Regions:
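Feature recognizes metal-dependent phosphohydrolase scaffolds
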Residues: 1-193
Length: 193
């Protein structure tokens, strides 16, 4: 697009990337087994497999204690670095993004409309239930746009929100859209996955 620069493109950290970020610090968790169980319940096993690791092997390191878990997380970190571009994109991921004039806010899964943007913390990844509560302009943004919804219900547009989740990765479609600064959809594609 005319006038675009590379910095205009922002990659958002999704729930899986947030779980991976926390997995790399598992040795610091007070109850690493409980934390890892939660991560497994939230599908981190696919990421482990992608880097040549397994749930069973990870559990063995956790059982061996903090030092063994630290060695394992360092090994996983090194495996990520060995894959060209993987570490670079993980470093570049942003919690949220907004247009220069503050018209549009882009998030992974949700927000808590009762909190300012700087206090959202985990709501960006786990705030699905609050997203549907947005029935007025949030913090001056014309639209809040998210790309993940637990039910993968497709494209949903309300006066103040947009959801783009056709279930990509779950047998559905990959949804993408281009918005003007008023939050109106000017182009949209849907690709079977």
């Amino acid at each position: 697009m005319p006038g675009m620069i590379p910095e205009d493109i922002v990659f958002l950290r999704g729930a899986q990337e947030e779980i991976l970020r926390n997995l790399l610090q598992l040795q610091l968790a007070p109850q690493p087994t409980d934390v890892f169980n939660w991560m497994i319940a939230n599908d981190i096993a696919y990421t482990l497999e992608a880097y040549g690791e397994s749930e069973e092997e990870t559990r063995r390191y956790i059982r061996e204690g903090t030092l063994a878990t630290t060695k394992w997380t360092n090994r996983l970190r090194e495996k990520i670095r060995e894959q060209p571009g993987h570490n670079d994109i993980l470093i570049a991921l942003r919690r949220a993004a907004f247009t220069e004039g503050g018209e549009l806010l882009f998030v992974h899964a949700g927000i808590d409309p009762n909190l300012p943007v700087v206090e959202q913390n985990d709501s960006f990844w786990w705030g699905n239930r609050h997203f549907k509560e947005i029935n007025t302009s949030y913090s001056g943004f014309r639209k809040v746009i998210r790309g993940f919804e637990k039910q993968h219900g497709g494209v949903t547009v309300t006066p103040y929100t947009v959801t783009l989740d056709g279930g990509s990765g779950y047998g559905g479609t990959l949804e993408a859209a281009c918005f003007n600064l008023d939050g109106k959809t000017v182009d949209q594609i849907s690709v079977p996955t």
